[in-house]
């Protein structure tokens, strides 16, 4: 074995880091840390007493609590929706499984802020749904703004992160373990809890992490739903020259993000891989086969039908206006160009980091 491949191992993984990927990963890490270092440097300039005063203000504490509640509730809702949907579309004889597999993944193509605009237009004050119910004497609908509405919107457009990762894990899982559990007279719920959940837990944790980070970083949806979270308040403070408050809130946001990453790693634990024959026998839903379609259709319909219907109504209204709607091709070109460039950079930057983390043991790859 030559010198380049003669490496130590740690629990089956090599421990001697290759020079090229290490330099690339270090460069990526440095680029990511530059904004954080600027925040820390600027935060030190605020002064200890001023920082304590700003961070302990009731409004600052309210923003922290609002953000924590939004992330916790939305992530929990995404798991509660995504995992059952994945199980139904992979492991059961749900009718039209292929159709529902696509339908419940489609909310990813709708930006959450577009969904927020659509829901406010439909269910907000004097919205389309309220006008529809006005002849029946309904003068006001429950308030859609605030925490509840924001959780609803973000859940509808981020649960696919959990669904897709859980579905991939369920499809690759060795179901002979489930068959073995059933032969030991475990019922379906106990089999799911003791066999299925431990195997899909890393995938579910990864999907929940994506949902949580999306919620934490989202600016458009909380702004439309009039709910003060880190991103919205930081933007307002920077715009009004409240740089000290914005910097301290940004540092809080970074700290919360690090905590979420740590928590995900603890929940995920060590990833499990199974080998052997795979049984593709589906779970028979029996008399619940067709009723099980109702919650699946409700989730997909709420996330897709409402925004599409509102957008079509706007399009129809614009066709009769004096200045009909025209397609802004320059905006579309800019969006596609920026998205493609960002995706390419993300892939190039992510490969060395992912390679080192997955291939080599030790703490340093984990730091990258």
Segments (PLM) and residue ranges:
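Membrane-topology segments of multi-pass transport proteins
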Residues: 1-20, 24, 48-53, 135-136, ...
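C-terminal transmembrane helix and the adjacent membrane-cytosol boundary/short C-terminal tail
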Residues: 2, 10, 38, 94, ...
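Peri-membrane helix termini and adjoining interfacial loops of integral membrane proteins
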Residues: 2, 40-52, 124-136, 225-231, ...
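Membrane-water interface segments at the C-terminal ends of transmembrane alpha-helices
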Residues: 14-46, 58-170, 199-219, 245-262, ...
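A short amphipathic helical element positioned immediately N-terminal to and/or at the very start
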Residues: 48-56, 320-323
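Hydrophobic positions on the alpha-helical face of helix-turn-helix-like DNA-binding modules
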Residues: 180-181, 191, 195, 234
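Glycine/proline-centered hinge or cleavage motifs at structural transition points of membrane proteins
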Residues: 184-185, 198
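Glycine-rich helix-loop "coupling/hinge" segments at transmembrane-helix boundaries
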Residues: 216-243
